[in-house]
């Protein structure tokens, strides 16, 4: 479609490996292809890529841009020098670049991806067991709990997802993030709150940190909040 209209295609690559895993496991014709081969096919269609390395780069900092056309790269080079650092490092320390190179390799290992994504699926199965609503199907990096369906007694003006995030933290010290009216921010012209259709609590699962016992703990804490949801009437 982009080629038809002469539009260059940019791929946000933050979770490229997780997406490749889902292509392999869910799309017909890809079951026997390796993750790296699927990634090659994805990027064969792209003109540019952006990469936040803190996601599928499995590092704590950094990122990069990729270009198919060297002329496009040259146009951006001066901005790297002005705002980030020289072209060979772009403001990143050598240690971080080495870690990123290794992280990109490891992120495309099928066993690593399956372990990570199945841990998220395990948490989803526990929420199913407790009847806690969330966005289905579960994704690769997080569970998005449906705060609007849980905190029905909290007015939307008092931020249901943020309220659920606070209740979960008070219950068990678990930090999630609100994806709702606070994130949407106020209308720049009217200064009124903007209320999106969904009010979600995102529980993003760090890589190579937690066991399924921790997922049990998260689910049990959410159940405790869910069981007393009728008593939560304000944000």
Which residue ranges define each predicted feature?
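Conserved PLP-enzyme active-site core in the AAT-like
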Residues: 1-132, 155
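Structural preference for beta-strand elements that scaffold enzyme active sites
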Residues: 8-10, 48, 142, 176, ...
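Short, glycine-/Ser/Thr-/acidic-enriched flexible segments
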Residues: 55-56, 69-72, 105-107, 140-141, ...
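Short, conserved charged micro-motifs
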Residues: 73-74, 152-160, 208-217
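PLP-dependent enzyme catalytic core of the Aspartate aminotransferase-like
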Residues: 107, 171, 183-235
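Conserved glycine-rich beta-strand-loop-beta hairpin in the small C-terminal domain of fold type I
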Residues: 119-121, 135-147
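Active-site loop ensemble at the mouth of alpha/beta enzyme cores that anchors a bound cofactor
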Residues: 148-175, 189-196
């Amino acid at each position: 479609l982009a080629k038809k209209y002469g539009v260059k295609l940019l791929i946000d690559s933050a979770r490229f490996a997780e997406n490749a895993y889902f292509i392999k496991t869910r799309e017909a014709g890809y079951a026997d292809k390796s993750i790296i081969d699927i990634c090659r096919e994805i990027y064969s269609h792209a003109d540019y890529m952006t990469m936040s390395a803190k996601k599928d780069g499995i590092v704590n900092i950094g990122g990069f841009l990729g270009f198919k056309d060297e002329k496009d790269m040259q146009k951006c080079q001066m901005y790297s020098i002005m705002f980030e650092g020289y072209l060979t490092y772009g403001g990143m320390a050598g240690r971080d670049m080495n870690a990123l190179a290794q992280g990109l390799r490891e992120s495309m290992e099928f066993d690593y991806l399956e372990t990570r994504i199945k841990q998220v699926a395990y948490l989803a199965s526990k929420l199913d067991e407790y009847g806690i609503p969330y966005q289905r199907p579960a994704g690769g990096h997080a569970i998005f709990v449906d705060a609007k369906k849980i905190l029905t007694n909290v007015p939307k003006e008092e931020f249901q997802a943020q309220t659920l995030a606070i209740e979960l933290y008070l219950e068990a010290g678990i930090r999630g993030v609100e994806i709702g009216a606070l994130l949407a921010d106020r209308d720049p012209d009217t200064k009124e709150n903007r209320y999106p259709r969904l009010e979600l609590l995102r529980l993003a699962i760090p890589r190579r940190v937690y066991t399924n016992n921790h997922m049990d703990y998260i689910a049990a804490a959410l159940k405790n909040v869910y069981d007393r949801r009728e008593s939560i009437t304000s944000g």
